[in-house]
Amino acid sequence: MTVLKGDNLEILKTIESSSIDLIYMDPPFFTQKTQKLSNNKNIMYSFEDTWTSIEDYKEFLSVRLEECKRVLKNSGSIFVHCDKIANHHIRLILDNIFGADMFQSEIIWNYKRWSNSKKGLLNNHQNIYFYSKSKDFKFNTIFTEYSSTTNIDQILVERKRDGNSKTIYKVDNNGNYIL
């Protein structure tokens, strides 16, 4: 297995047609913000997620998704990660490029949020759309055990705010979560 990281349009253009089994795409979410991942204020990763219009954003995605379709094998599949901001646009683009009949499933990635918002409900999930290039797609079922404590642990761990006012888990001097 090979994982490629970078501007997927530039990478996709170098890939032979009908040669890829699976694509996982995590595009910008149309947040209209600069996204930064940092550790102690040292920026480790940053990208612009700002657009002049939703049409520009949709064109950005469409060009890339057309290339994804080109490089997928006939038995290939694509998973596209998005959130509530543009998921309805992305679903229509995917239907247009791959065909609505190639939609296989929608995965809901649910996560816990503690709501203290005065403006309404906070988002607590993201979407991953699963499309195939044809009806002859490959899908290998893998069964694993679920952790019976995953959600309980998330609920029980104490939280605090960091210097950027983000909620983080409290840890002791050894780096262990405090329950």
What are these regions (language model features)?
Residues M1-L179:
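Core catalytic lobe of class I
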